[in-house]
Regions:
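Generic, well-ordered alpha-helical scaffold segments in large soluble proteins
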Residues: 14, 18, 97-100, 120-124, ...
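Long, highly charged, low-complexity internal segments
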Residues: 35, 43-83, 191-303, 307, ...
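Leucine-rich, amphipathic alpha-helical/linker segments
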Residues: 339-367, 535-580
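Intrinsically disordered, low-complexity regulatory segments
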Residues: 1-168, 172-174, 465
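Accessory beta->alpha helical hairpin/"wing" motif in late/C-terminal subdomains of nucleic-acid enzymes
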Residues: 312-337, 350, 499-535
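Core structural elements
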Residues: 166-179, 224-226, 270-282, 296, ...
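Helical mechanochemical/support elements of P-loop NTPase systems and associated helical scaffolds
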Residues: 11, 15, 86-97, 110-121, ...
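Active-site phosphate-binding and catalytic loops of NTP-dependent enzymes
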Residues: 23-27, 154-159, 180-184, 209-214, ...
Length: 590
C-alpha cells in the first residue's frame, strides 16, 4: 500500500480521484493500492520556551534557543492558547495511514514551505518508510498523471528543506528573542516582533506619521494657450513658481504678450513591448490597483483557481516559462481564443512572438502563472477578475508591441520658457487588451491629432491662466505599494508576504481604512518603542533570502547561516535592553 500526503483536503481528494482511490474514509481516501490523506496547512511548529518549562526569562537567558522538538499548532480559545483539536485529530489519522503503508509519496505544496511541512510531519510521526516526491505545477489530470509517472527521490530536495528549516529557525530566533526582550524591557507581554513584520509595520507607521506631520507648500503654475489649425493647445511654464508675486507678474506679462515663439520640436516613436507574465507579486499589485482586491484576497483566490485546475501554481516569483511548458501553450491559447470574449484578438496573437519569456534553462522553481487548458465553469466575481487578469496578461505577451509617438514642444513667451508634452498611440498592439493608456503615457497629455509645429514659428497667444496649487501629503500605503515595498526591500518571499500582512492584521497592529493600510494605536505604540532600532530596519535581514538560496544550491551550510543569525539576535536584544530600562506598566497598556 502506498500513502500520499497533501497539505489540503481538496488537493488530496483530487489526486485520489485521478488515481482511482475513491473510497472515502474519515480524513483520507483509499482504493487502487493508495491511501491519500492530508493536513490542514502547517499543523506543526517549533516549540516555544514555555513548552520546555521556561516560565520566566531573565536577561542572562538570552539568546533563547528553540527546543529540539515540534509541537502541534496552537489556536486562541477562551482559556488561552491551546493545541488545535482539529490538527490533533488529523495527525492521528495521518499516523494511522502512514503506519499502514510501506511507501510514502510527499504531495505537499511544491515549494520550500511544502517541503518543510512534509519533512516535519515525517519526523514528528517517527516514519521510517522510503518516500518519493510528487512535484507538479498544476492540478490537471494530465499533470497529476505525468507527475505520478515521474516521481522524484526525496533526497533530491534535501537542500530545499534545509533552506526552509533554516528560514523557520531564523525567524524563531529573531522573532522570539526580540519579542521576549521588548516585553521584558517595557514591562508587559502583549507585543510581538518579527524579522519581516516589524520592518513592514515600521514603514507603514513612518509614512502615516509623515502624512500626519505634513505641511502643504504653495505653488502657482502659469499656463498659456495658443491656437493653430483651429486647435487650442495649453502650454505650461517649465517651473512652478513658489512666490505668488512672481507668478502674478509672469501672468500679467503673458497676458500682455501678443505672440509665442516655438523654440524646439522633438518627436520620437517608441515600440513598447508587452509586460512579462505574472508572478504572484505582480498579480497582487495589479489586482489591487485595478480591482481593489487585497494581497490576502488575491493569494487566496489564486490558490482557489489553482485547485480548480484553471491556472498553474500561483505562489511563484518567476515571470518566465521553461521551453517545454512554453511549447504546450499554442493549443491552450487557441482554445482560449475560441471563446467569444477573446475571439477578436485571434488575428493579432502571434504564438511565436515572446521568445524572451523562455527561461535559459529548466529549474525546479515554479514558472510564471499561466492558465491551463481547463475551461472555467461558474466563477464568482472576484475569481473572474483575477482569472481575467491572468488571461489578459497571456494575450498581451503574445501580441505585437505598442507603437507610441511622443512629442515635446518648447516655446518662449514673455522671455520665459513654456512646454507641452504629448503622446499618441499609433498602433495599440498588446495595449488593446485592457486599454490602459497610463502605462505608456509617461506623464504626458494624450493628443491623438497633434498640429505640426516648426522651430522659430511665431503663433498668437490665445489666452493665459494662473492656478494656485497646494502640495498634497503622501497617501497611506495600499496593498499594491506594500507588496512592491517588501519585494524591493527583500522582505519575505511571494509565499510569505501575505502571511506577514495577515499577522499584522490579526495582532491588531494595522487595519484597513478603505483601500489604505493604516496603523492602529497599538501598532503606533510598538513603532515608537522600536523606532530607529535594528529590529525595525528592513536592511537587517534583507540578505537572508540570498543566503537561503545559497543553502538551496548547497553552497552554504545551515550551521554557518544560523551562526550569523545568532550574532544578529545578540545585537538586537542587546540594543533593546540598552534603550529601554525596565519600566512597569499596567497589563494591556498601549
Amino acid at each position: 500500500m502506498i500513502a500520499i500526503v497533501t497539505d489540503r483536503p481538496n488537493v488530496g481528494r483530487e489526486i485520489a480521484r485521478v488515481l482511482g482511490a475513491g473510497r472515502k474514509e474519515n480524513g483520507y481516501m483509499t482504493g487502487n493500492g493508495y491511501m491519500v490523506t492530508w493536513t490542514y496547512g502547517n499543523m506543526l511548529s517549533l516549540a516555544m520556551p514555555k513548552d520546555s518549562g521556561t516560565a520566566h526569562v531573565e536577561w542572562k537567558d538570552f539568546p533563547l534557543l528553540p527546543p529540539s522538538f515540534l509541537t502541534v499548532r496552537h489556536v486562541k480559545t477562551d482559556t488561552g492558547w491551546n493545541p488545535d483539536i482539529n490538527a490533533v485529530l488529523q495527525l492521528k489519522v495521518i499516523a494511522k495511514v502512514l503506519n499502514a503503508c510501506d511507501t510514502i509519496i510527499a504531495a505537499t505544496d511544491a515549494s520550500r514551505e511544502g517541503e518543510m511541512l512534509f519533512r516535519h510531519l515525517y519526523g514528528f510521526l517517527g516514519c521510517k518508510q522510503p518516500c518519493l516526491r510528487l512535484w507538479i505545477s498544476s492540478l490537471t489530470d494530465e499533470a497529476i498523471t505525468e507527475g505520478m509517472a515521474n516521481l522524484l527521490p526525496c533526497d533530491r530536495f534535501d537542500n530545499l528543506f534545509l533552506a526552509a528549516d533554516s528560514r523557520n529557525r531564523a525567524d524563531w530566533l529573531l522573532g522570539v528573542n526580540s519579542s521576549y526582550a521588548i516585553c521584558k524591557a517595557v514591562g508587559f507581554g502583549n507585543n510581538s516582533l518579527g524579522r519581516v513584520q516589524t520592518p513592514v509595520l515600521a514603514e507603514i507607521c513612518r509614512r502615516y506619521r509623515e502624512r500626519e506631520n505634513f505641511l502643504p507648500a504653495d505653488s502657482w503654475p502659469v499656463f498659456i494657450s495658443l491656437c493653430k489649425n483651429d486647435r487650442i493647445l495649453k502650454m505650461r511654464h517649465v517651473d512652478d513658481l513658489v512666490v505668488r508675486r512672481e507668478a502674478l507678474a509672469l501672468y500679467e506679462d503673458c497676458k500682455a504678450a501678443k505672440s509665442v515663439r516655438i523654440t524646439a520640436v522633438g518627436k520620437r516613436t517608441e515600440e513598447i513591448g508587452a509586460p512579462a507574465l505574472y508572478n504572484l507579486a505582480e498579480l497582487q499589485k495589479d489586482a489591487n490597483r485595478y480591482h481593489s482586491l487585497t494581497a490576502i484576497q488575491v493569494q487566496e483566490i489564486a490558490q482557489g483557481l489553482y485547485e480548480k485546475k484553471l491556472i498553474s501554481y500561483p505562489r511563484t516569483s518567476s515571470r518566465l516559462l521553461p521551453k517545454d511548458v512554453y511549447d504546450t501553450l499554442p493549443p491552450v491559447m487557441e482554445k482560449m481564443l475560441s471563446r467569444k470574449e477573446f475571439r477578436q484578438y485571434a488575428d493579432t496573437v502571434d504564438l511565436a512572438a515572446p521568445r524572451d519569456s523562455i527561461e535559459a534553462q529548466d529549474t525546479m522553481e515554479h514558472h510564471a502563472i499561466i492558465i491551463t487548458g481547463t475551461q472555467p465553469g461558474k466563477l464568482d466575481r472576484e475569481e473572474m477578475l483575477v482569472y481575467t487578469l491572468i488571461v489578459g496578461r497571456m494575450l498581451e505577451t503574445f501580441m505585437p508591441p505598442c507603437k507610441v509617438e511622443y512629442t515635446t514642444v518648447d516655446a518662449v513667451c514673455a522671455a520665459r520658457k513654456f512646454r507641452i508634452r504629448t503622446y499618441r498611440i499609433l498602433e495599440k498592439g498588446w495595449l488593446g487588451i485592457f486599454e490602459r493608456e497610463h502605462i505608456v503615457a509617461k506623464g504626458r497629455m494624450p493628443y491623438q491629432v497633434m498640429p505640426e509645429f516648426f522651430q522659430e514659428e511665431i503663433l498668437p497667444v490665445a489666452g493665459c491662466s494662473l492656478i494656485h496649487k497646494k502640495s498634497l501629503p503622501v497617501s497611506p500605503y495600499t496593498d499594491e505599494e506594500l507588496v512592491d515595498y517588501m519585494d524591493k526591500a527583500g522582505l519575505g518571499t511571494v509565499s510569505t508576504r501575505t502571511n506577514i500582512l495577515r499577522t499584522l492584521l490579526e495582532r491588531k497592529y494595522i487595519r484597513y481604512s478603505g483601500k489604505y493600510v493604516v496603523p492602529t494605536p497599538k501598532g503606533l505604540f510598538l513603532y515608537e518603542t522600536v523606532r530607529g532600532m535594528k529590529v525595525a530596519d528592513a536592511s537587517l535581514t534583507s540578505g537572508w533570502e540570498t543566503e537561503l538560496a545559497r543553502i538551496e544550491r548547497g553552497e552554504l551550510s545551515q550551521e554557518e547561516f544560523l551562526d550569523g543569525v545568532l550574532e544578529t539576535v545578540n545585537e538586537v536584544t542587546g540594543e533593546i535592553s540598552r534603550n529601554h530600562p525596565v519600566e512597569k506598566r499596567p497589563q494591556g497598556t498601549i
